[in-house]
Amino acid sequence: MAVVAVLVRKPLEQVSGLLRRRFHRTAPAALQVTVREAINQGMDEELERDEKVFLLGEEVAQYDGAYKVSRGLWKKYGDKRIIDTPISEMGFAGIAVGAAMAGLRPICEFMTFNFSMQAIDQVINSAAKTYYMSGGLQSVPIVFRGPNGASAGVAAQHSQCFAAWYGHCPGLKVVSPWSSEDAKGLIKSAIRDNNPVVVLENELMYGVPFELPSEAQSKDFLIPIGKAKIERQGTHVTIVAHSRPVGHCLEAATVLSKEGIECEVINLRTIRPMDIETIEGSVMKTNHLVTVEGGWPQFGVGAEICARIMEGPAFNFLDAPAVRVTGADVPMPYAKILEDNSVPQVKDIIFAIKKTLNI
């Protein structure tokens, strides 16, 4: 009653201020979305938006996909747009390329990109080169997507990173998402693109939740292909990575920050075309460069970044040679302890950063 009496005696503006102080709304919890859910959401929105879009691959329909990325899509869109295929990558990739040439927009899922080797002729010779060979008359709007790179306990034939393989080929666009925001924005941009786009996902990231910004929750949200993102600002060293190693780089940056070393972490997002301008701008600021990737060292993504920096204006700003952190130059072992030592770890990134900083 005392509170009521006070309210009665005070002017309205003071009463409303008092109420705001006494009664406040709890801020809404951030929307947590896994990478798997983000890809699913992106495909769902594009399937709904454009009836020319369809998904095909092994077990993508009734089984909801080997990694459940296509969960619920078959029930929503039916057999004509969510299509289970035989175990023949050469066959269904060829069907998808032909459909793209005929004006549809197929999403061709490889259960793992290691199996895309069975369809390399369709991806490279048929999809990537047709626009050029037709003098720009025949576009091939197709998406090749699926898990890429090292997983857990699947050994040499199921653990390769194809970023450098496909990034080498003119006519392809190649993206490699890390977060849920990356995954949704890049898959939607890939589906809308009139060129063949390779989307290199990561099996170990599918179940990892990220906070999805409000703008990324929009059905109109797109991430431009060919544009990197600075995930963390820094002044002492530039670290460039894509896919799962981005998280390792951020962990390393957190550790080194306690020692007074501030790292700028760049999430590459797109392998081809590469956003070299963002990397150059960062290197000109930090004067040091470390690249991190899960693939093999020879002719890799890091090697290309280092070459481009050496050939461009940022080279004169380097105070030390660039350093690469890569997977080991061996086929992926099966034993866990050997597997762990074959892919970059946080400690390897920290060692490389201290090496280039000479500390």
Curated annotation (Swiss-Prot):
Record Gene3D superfamilies: 3.40.50.920, 3.40.50.970
Modified residues (N6-acetyllysine): 354
GO cellular component: mitochondrial matrix; nucleoplasm; pyruvate dehydrogenase complex
Transit peptide, residues from-to: 1-30
Site features described as Important for interaction with DLAT, chain residue numbers: 319
Molecular-function annotations in GO: metal ion binding; pyruvate dehydrogenase (acetyl-transferring) activity; pyruvate dehydrogenase (NAD+) activity
Pfam families referenced in this protein's UniProt entry, alphabetically: Transket_pyr, Transketolase_C
GO biological process: glucose metabolic process; pyruvate decarboxylation to acetyl-CoA; tricarboxylic acid cycle
Residues recorded as bearing Phosphotyrosine in the entry: 67
Cofactor: thiamine diphosphate
Compartments, as annotated in UniProt: Mitochondrion matrix
Binding site for thiamine diphosphate: 89
Binding site for K(+): 142, 190-191, 193, 195
EC code(s) of this entry: 1.2.4.1
Catalyses which reaction(s): N(6)-[(R)-lipoyl]-L-lysyl-[protein] + pyruvate + H(+) = N(6)-[(R)-S(8)-acetyldihydrolipoyl]-L-lysyl-[protein] + CO2
Keyword vocabulary terms for this entry: Acetylation, Carbohydrate metabolism, Glucose metabolism, Metal-binding, Mitochondrion, Oxidoreductase, Phosphoprotein, Potassium, Pyruvate, Thiamine pyrophosphate, Transit peptide, Tricarboxylic acid cycle
Assembly behavior: Heterotetramer of two PDHA1 and two PDHB subunits. The heterotetramer interacts with DLAT, and is part of the multimeric pyruvate dehydrogenase complex that contains multiple copies of pyruvate dehydrogenase (E1), dihydrolipoamide acetyltransferase (DLAT, E2) and lipoamide dehydrogenase (DLD, E3). These subunits are bound to an inner core composed of about 48 DLAT and 12 PDHX molecules. Interacts with DLAT.
Record function comment: The pyruvate dehydrogenase complex catalyzes the overall conversion of pyruvate to acetyl-CoA and CO(2), and thereby links the glycolytic pathway to the tricarboxylic cycle.
Name of the protein this chain belongs to: Pyruvate dehydrogenase E1 component subunit beta, mitochondrial
Name of encoding gene: PDHB
